[in-house]
């Protein structure tokens, strides 16, 4: 079963930041500078975590993966032109 996740990161080195960004572009929808919305299976989530661990320096970088409830409402304040299909938005 596929579940939604919010992946947020703070990478201290520009090279690692670019590598994580390029990797994440293939995994989810880029919704803010260092934030991606992903819909993943358990296997895809596990593989994504393993790959991210290879790309970051665990002492200096911070990556957080938040599970989101299915069918959750999303509030977008400000410019909201980056909403993925299937995500409901209320104003």
Swiss-Prot record:
Example GO BP: maintenance of CRISPR repeat elements
Entry GO MF terms: metal ion binding; RNA endonuclease activity
Amino-acid positions noted as binding Mg(2+) in the UniProt annotation, renumbered to this chain: 10
Tagged with keyword Lipoprotein: no
Keywords: Antiviral defense, Endonuclease, Hydrolase, Magnesium, Metal-binding, Nuclease
Cofactors required: Mg(2+)
EC number: 3.1.-.-
UniProt enzyme class: hydrolase
Protein role: CRISPR (clustered regularly interspaced short palindromic repeat), is an adaptive immune system that provides protection against mobile genetic elements (viruses, transposable elements and conjugative plasmids). CRISPR clusters contain sequences complementary to antecedent mobile elements and target invading nucleic acids. CRISPR clusters are transcribed and processed into CRISPR RNA (crRNA). Functions as a ssRNA-specific endoribonuclease. Involved in the integration of spacer DNA into the CRISPR cassette.
Similarity comment: family membership: Belongs to the CRISPR-associated endoribonuclease Cas2 protein family.
Subunit structure, interactors included: Homodimer, forms a heterotetramer with a Cas1 homodimer.
Stated name of the protein: CRISPR-associated endoribonuclease Cas2 2
Gene that encodes the chain: cas2-2
